[in-house]
Amino acid sequence: MLFVGLLVVGVVVGFISGFFGIGGGTVVVPVMILFGYDIKYAIGVSIMQMIFSSVFGSFVNFKSKMLDIKPALILGFGGFCGALTSGFIVSYFSSKFLLGVLILVQIINLIKLFKTPAEPVGEANGSKILLFLVGLVVGAVAISVGIGGSVLVIPILISFLNYDIKRAVGTGLFFVVFSSTAGFLSLAAHELVHYDVGIMLGLGSLIGVYFGVKTSHKISKTAQKRWMVALISTILMITARKFLLS
């Protein structure tokens, strides 16, 4: 029964990952806690699942010409470096402190994203140093609380670096490939991963992410931005509730 439940969760999370360009940890971690897992092990499982969905989803985006490899690689390398510190951060800082940092970043992103038009004006900021630094900071913070980081990266790309939303979503999902791989290695070294559960979730996510990516390609930029604002608002409320109850 647990096996079927994990596969279903994986499919749902995969669709969300592909549609929004996120890792899916914001869904997986609460569900794993509901299944009785400690939050630190829930984070480990969440990160492992992200590897499956982000790699396959990025492949689909690339084949559909919705992914610019060069800037995404720079951003991803920064995320990889930042995420390597996640094992230390999770072990050293309290969960409440990490949630507080995440809430602050989400509030800033949401306000800025809400004010930014769906269609960008002018060229995107392609600064390699800036992309690397964004990846570095987001990778360190996000993986430490069990999310891939693109839910933070995408609003930054849209609102601060003037990215087109569809380009930002493709870049965000590719970012998760790097951050989740580094986070997985770091958390595995600290023995915080249940491999069997992560594999079951990952297999389910392969199905969902394909349909999520294809759906995101078909909807308008305005509609996609509205869905993104709704997603971040929901995540913010869930995170704030968790912070207040912790």
Predicted regions, residues:
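Short hydrophobic/aromatic, small-residue-rich stretches within specific transmembrane helices
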Residues: 46-50, 76, 172-176, 197-202
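Hydrophobic alpha-helical transmembrane segments of multi-pass integral membrane proteins
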Residues: 111, 167-183
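Membrane-embedded alpha-helical segments of transport systems
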Residues: 48-56, 81-82, 89, 175-182
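Small-residue hotspots at the loop-to-helix junctions and early N-terminal turns
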Residues: 39-44, 169, 173
